[in-house]
């Protein structure tokens, strides 16, 4: 016996590509404002880093990008800083450009040509107690920080900050 299911969908119920992009970006902003602070608090993280390269993205990174971004660009660095006293989350791109409307660029390549040094300076200025990075022996989706980027991160951070890295 073969069963056929018929789903009736009117054209008016399907969002246009533009409207889907708007909805996705609204949902992303909601996650940044409401879900991310709680998750960082639950994990006892003051800071969380996402570092990816074009064509080799951290699986989590794609869930943090706006609708019109399909991938990382060159080396994409995103830093989330949770200030519990002020109940805020800074969303910073260590990139030459903003990542959509939700993540603002904090790197001026003309003033500091070294992206890793710029990242290190931004982290040091905030002096977090715990810095989350994505690596895991047990969960593939939590193992997005590639070895090369991990080594560059450790090489460019002062020892006082390297000791604060956790996964």
Regions found by a protein language model. Name each.
Residues 1-13:
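Bacterial Sec-dependent N-terminal signal peptides
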Residues 11-167:
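A composition/biophysics-driven feature that prefers long, compositionally simple stretches
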